[in-house]
C-alpha cells in the first residue's frame, strides 16, 4: 500500500514548551532538577507529536527530528564531531556540553550560526580541521527509538546525511578540503545505522538537501561510494532531497544503492518527470506534495491529479509526503481562536498537513470518494481564496504599475550625500551605534500582556513604553554612543509589529516557528495586497529624538525581509508582493523624514536568505530585491542617512548587489566569523560606509574592551577609518541589561582607543 509519512515535525511544542523549558534550564544554571525537567519536557513533546502523526493516519512516525537546540548540532553529537576546541568527550557528552557548543562558555565562543539553505531557520556551523575525528557519540537517537516503540509506533529515523553534514561545515586550521574527512565520517555513520537496524528500525531517512544545489563534481562523485559503504548492514535508506530541483542529479541519485528517494514537488514540481522516467524497480519514490514551508491549505484535487500518474507507474512504491520537514510551519491551527474565520479556512499548520498527506494516500489507495468530505472542503477553500474581495486592492495595483526606474534610485550619488550628512551630523571618526533593539525585559512583557488582555488601557500602555524609551536613551547617553535608537520596546517582533499595522497582513496568536535554539518567531501571513493606512513608527521615533540632541535612528524592517520572514501568498509573484511592501515603507520613510528624523535604518537581514539555491535564478531575484529596497529608501533628501543591517549572511558572492542597494551605511554580523566576512572587501571596493559587528549578541558571554579593540583593528585592515562604524552584530532584544551595559561600555571604550590611535597616526 502507498505509504504516507512526513520528513519531520516542529520540535518546539504547540505552546512553545521546549522554548520555556530551555530557558528555565539555562536560567537555573543547568542544575540537576532543571535538567530533569528539560528531559521530561522533551520526552512529553515527542510523545505528543508522534500521537498527532499517528492520529492523522500516517504509516510511520519520524524519530530523530527532535533536537534540543539544532538538528545539525545534534547530528554532530551523534557522530562524535563537535568542535575539538571545547575539549568534550564525545561518548560522555552532557547536555551542558551540548549547549556550551551552541551558546559559548567562559572559555570558548559559541559555534558560528548561519541560515539553513534559503529558510529562516539557523543551524550551527560544523568546524572541521585536519585533526577532526568522528566516532560513537550520544545515545539520544536510540532513546527516541525506544520511546516510540514503547508507545506502539512504527518508527522511521531521520538523520542529516554525511555529505550534507560535511558541506555545511567550515574548513579550519589548514584543512584544504572538507571531503578529505569523508573516510573518517562514513564509519561513524555506518556504525550508527547498524545500531538502528539492531534496534528494529526498518527505514532511515537520510537528508541530503545539498543535491538541490549546483554541486561541484567532487561532491557528486563522492555520493555513490559513500552510500555503497553505508547500505550494507543498514536499515532501508531513503535519501531525501528538498528545497529545490534535484533533477540534474537524478541519474546519479537513482543509481545509488538505497531503497528510496524523496523529491520536493512544491518547490520544483517539474523535476518529477526526470525521476519517474526509468525509475528503478527496487526503490520507492517519496513525493513531497504538501508544502512544508508555507501555511496555505493544500489543493487536494490538484495534488491527487499530479500523483495519480505516478501511482499508475510505480504502484505501492509511491510514498506521499511533505515537501520537507514541518519544522518551518506552526504546530496546530486549532490554537488560533481569534484568527479571521474565512482566512482560517485557507490555512493548514503542521498538524493539519499531516492529515493532508494521509488524505492523499487514502484517495490514491481507496479512491477520492473515500475522503470526499475532506477533498470537497479543500476545493471550496481554494475557490473562495481565488475570488475573495479582501485579497485585491485596486489602488495598490495602480501604484505598483506606475513605478519607474527613477523611483528606485537616490537623487544624488553617495559622495554628494555623504558630504551633506557629514555637515548635518558632525559625527566623530569610527562612530558608535547599535542595531536597534534593546532587552525585552519582564516589565515590557508584563505591560504588553496586560494591554492585550485588556487589563492595561491604551494610554497606560503607551506611557509604559515611553518610560522604556526614556530608559534606553538615558543608558545610551551614559555609554557615550554617538548615534542612538529608541530600543523598540513596543515591538514584539521586527516583522510582526509591522504586519499588525499594514493592510494585507494577518497576525496569528500562536503561529510560532523555531528560528534557532529557544528563539521562536511568529511570522505574519501576507494574504492580500499590502497598503499603509497611517504612519507606524513616527510617534516613537519623534519621542525618542526629543530626549537627546544626538541623532536617533528611525527603525524599519525592509521589504525583502518582511517577505522572507512572513508566510507569503502564493497567488502572485513574490516580486510583486515585495514592491507592494516597498511602497508602504517608502511612505513611512517620508513620514519619518518630515518629522525630523535624519537617520532611517531599513533592515534587510534576510536579503541573502532569499537568494535562490540555483545560480541561474539568482540574478532575477537580486534585481527585484534591490529594486524593492530602492523603492523603500530612495524618496528622502541627500542629508537623510539611510542605514541597513544584514545578519547571518555570507554575502561575498552578492557584494555588487549589496552595493547596488546604495545604503549610506550598512551594518553586518561578523563577530563569530572573526571578521572573515570582511575578506570579500579586499577584492571588492565597497563604496559606502560599513559597520562590521564587534559584539556577538547571540551568546551570553560579554566581551571586554581589548577583545573588541582587536576586532576593530582587524576591520581597519580592510575598511578605511573614514567609512567604518562600530556596532554590535545584531539587535540586543534577547540579552539582559547587565550584559548590554557591560558590552556597550566596552565597545565605546574600544572605539575611543582605536579612534585615538588612528588620529595620532594621521599627520597634522
Swiss-Prot record:
Provide this UniProt record's keywords sorted from A to Z.
Amino-acid biosynthesis, Metal-binding, Methionine biosynthesis, Methyltransferase, Repeat, Transferase, Zinc
**Which pathway does UniProt place it in?**
Amino-acid biosynthesis; L-methionine biosynthesis via de novo pathway; L-methionine from L-homocysteine (MetE route): step 1/1
Q: Which GO terms describe its molecular function?
A: 5-methyltetrahydropteroyltriglutamate-homocysteine S-methyltransferase activity; zinc ion binding
In this chain, Zn(2+) is annotated as bound at 645, 647, 669, 730
According to its UniProt record, the EC number is 2.1.1.14
Q: A Pfam family name for this chain?
A: Meth_synt_2
Q: Where is the signal peptide?
A: none
InterPro entries attached to this UniProt entry = Cbl-indep_Met_Synth_N (IPR013215), Cobalamin-indep_Met_synthase (IPR006276), Met_Synth_C/arc (IPR002629), UROD/MetE-like_sf (IPR038071)
Q: Which residues bind L-methionine?
A: 435-437, 488, 603
Q: Where does L-homocysteine bind?
A: 435-437, 488, 603
The family assignment reads:
Belongs to the vitamin-B12 independent methionine synthase family.
Protein name per UniProt: 5-methyltetrahydropteroyltriglutamate--homocysteine methyltransferase
Native organism is Burkholderia pseudomallei (strain 1106a)
Amino acid at each position: 500500500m502507498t505509504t504516507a509519512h512526513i520528513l519531520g515535525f516542529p520540535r518546539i511544542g504547540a505552546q512553545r514548551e521546549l522554548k520555556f523549558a530551555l530557558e528555565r534550564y539555562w536560567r537555573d544554571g543547568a542544575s540537576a532538577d532543571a535538567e530533569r525537567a528539560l528531559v521530561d519536557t522533551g520526552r512529553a513533546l515527542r510523545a505528543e507529536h508522534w500521537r498527532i502523526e499517528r492520529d492523522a493516519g500516517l504509516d510511520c512516525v519520524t524519530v530523530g527530528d527532535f533536537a534540543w537546540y539544532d538538528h545539525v548540532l545534534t547530528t554532530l553529537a551523534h557522530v562524535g564531531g563537535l568542535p575539538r576546541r571545547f575539549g568534550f568527550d564525545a561518548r560522555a557528552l552532557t547536555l551542558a556540553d551540548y549547549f556550551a557548543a551552541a551558546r559559548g562558555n567562559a572559555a570558548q565562543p559559541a559555534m558560528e550560526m548561519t541560515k539553513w539553505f534559503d529558510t529562516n531557520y539557523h543551524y550551527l556551523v560544523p568546524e572541521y580541521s585536519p585533526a577532526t575525528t568522528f566516532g560513537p557519540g550520544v545515545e539520544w537517537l536510540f532513546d527516541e527509538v525506544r520511546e516510540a516503540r514503547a508507545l506502539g509506533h512504527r518508527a522511521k529515523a531521520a538523520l542529516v546525511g554525511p555529505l550534507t553534514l560535511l558541506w555545511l561545515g567550515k574548513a579550519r586550521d589548514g584543512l584544504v578540503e572538507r571531503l578529505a574527512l569523508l573516510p573518517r565520517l562514513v564509519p561513524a555513520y555506518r556504525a550508527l545505522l547498524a545500531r538502528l537496524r539492531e534496534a528494529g528500525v526498518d527505514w532511515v531517512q537520510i537528508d541530503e538537501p545539498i543535491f538541490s544545489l549546483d554541486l561541484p563534481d567532487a561532491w557528486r562523485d563522492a555520493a555513490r561510494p559513500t552510500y555503497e559503504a553505508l547500505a550494507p548492514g543498514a536499515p532501508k535508506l531513503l535519501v531525501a532531497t528538498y528545497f529545490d530541483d534535484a533533477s540534474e542529479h537524478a541519474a546519479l541519485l537513482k543509481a545509488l544503492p538505497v531503497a528510496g528517494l524523496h523529491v520536493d514537488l512544491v518547490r520544483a514540481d517539474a523535476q518529477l518527470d526526470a525521476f519517474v522516467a526509468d525509475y528503478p524497480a527496487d526503490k520507492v519514490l517519496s513525493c513531497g506534495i504538501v508544502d512544508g514551508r508555507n501555511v496555505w491549505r493544500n489543493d487536494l484535487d490538484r495534488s491527487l491529479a499530479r500523483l495519480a500518474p505516478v501511482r499508475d507507474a510505480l504502484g505501492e512504491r509511491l510514498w506521499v509526503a511533505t515537501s520537507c520537514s514541518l519544522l518551518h510551519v506552526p504546530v496546530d491551527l486549532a490554537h488560533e481562536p481569534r484568527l479571521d474565520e474565512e482566512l482560517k479556512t485557507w490555512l493548514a499548520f503542521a498538524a493539519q498537513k499531516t492529515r493532508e498527506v494521509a488524505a492523499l494516500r487514502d484517495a490514491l489507495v481507496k479512491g477520492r470518494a473515500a475522503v470526499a468530505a475532506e477533498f470537497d472542503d479543500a476545493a471550496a477553500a481554494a475557490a473562495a481564496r481565488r475570488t475573495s474581495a479582501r485579497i485585491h486592492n485596486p489602488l495598490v495595483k495602480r501604484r505598483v504599475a506606475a513605478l519607474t526606474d527613477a523611483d528606485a534610485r537616490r537623487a544624488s550619488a553617495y559622495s554628494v550625500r555623504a558630504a551633506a550628512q557629514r555637515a548635518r551630523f558632525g559625527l566623530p571618526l569610527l562612530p558608535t551605534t547599535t542595531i536597534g533593539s534593546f532587552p525585552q525585559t519582564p516589565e515590557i512583557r508584563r505591560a504588553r500582556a496586560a494591554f492585550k488582555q485588556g487589563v492595561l488601557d491604551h494610554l497606560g500602555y503607551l506611557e509604559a513604553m515611553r518610560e522604556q524609551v526614556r530608559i534606553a536613551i538615558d543608558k545610551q547617553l551614559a555609554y557615550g554612543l554617538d548615534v542612538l535608537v529608541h530600543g523598540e520596546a513596543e515591538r514584539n517582533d521586527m516583522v510582526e509589529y509591522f504586519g499588525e499595522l499594514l493592510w494585507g497582513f494577518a497576525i496569528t496568536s500562536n503561529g510560532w516557528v523555531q528560528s534557532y535554539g529557544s528563539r521562536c518567531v511568529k511570522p505574519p501571513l501576507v494574504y492580500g495586497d499590502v497598503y499603509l493606512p497611517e504612519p507606524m513608527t513616527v510617534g516613537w521615533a519623534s519621542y525618542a529624538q526629543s530626549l537627546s540632541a544626538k541623532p536617533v535612528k528611525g527603525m524599519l524592517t525592509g521589504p525583502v525581509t518582511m517577505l522572507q520572514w512572513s508566510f507569503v501568498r502564493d497567488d502572485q509573484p513574490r516580486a510583486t508582493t515585495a514592491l507592494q511592501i516597498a511602497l508602504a515603507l517608502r511612505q513611512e520613510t517620508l513620514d519619518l523624514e518630515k518629522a525630523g528624523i535624519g537617520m532611517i535604518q531599513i533592515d534587510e537581514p534576510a536579503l541573502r536568505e532569499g537568494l535562490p539555491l540555483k545560480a541561474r535564478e539568482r540574478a532575477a531575484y537580486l534585481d527585484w530585491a534591490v529594486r524593492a529596497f530602492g523603492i523603500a529608501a530612495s524618496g528622502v533628501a541627500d542629508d537623510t542617512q539611510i542605514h541597513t543591517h544584514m545578519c547571518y549572511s555570507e554575502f561575498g558572492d552578492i557584494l555588487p548587489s549589496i552595493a547596488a542597494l546604495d545604503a549610506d551605511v550598512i551594518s553586518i554580523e561578523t563577530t563569530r566569523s572573526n571578521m572573515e566576512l570582511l575578506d570579500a572587501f579586499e577584492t571588492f571596493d565597497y563604496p559606502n560606509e560599513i559597520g562590521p559587528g564587534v559584539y556577538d549578541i547571540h551568546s551570553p558571554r560579554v566581551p571586554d574592551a581589548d577583545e573588541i579593540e582587536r576586532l576593530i583593528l582587524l576591520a581597519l585592515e580592510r575598511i578605511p577609518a573614514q567609512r567604518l562604524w562600530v556596532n554590535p552584530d545584531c539587535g540586543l532584544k534577547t540579552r539582559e541589561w547587565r550584559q548590554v551595559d557591560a558590552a556597550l561600555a566596552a565597545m565605546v571604550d574600544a572605539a575611543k582607543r582605536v579612534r585615538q590611535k588612528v588620529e595620532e597616526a594621521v599627520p597634522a
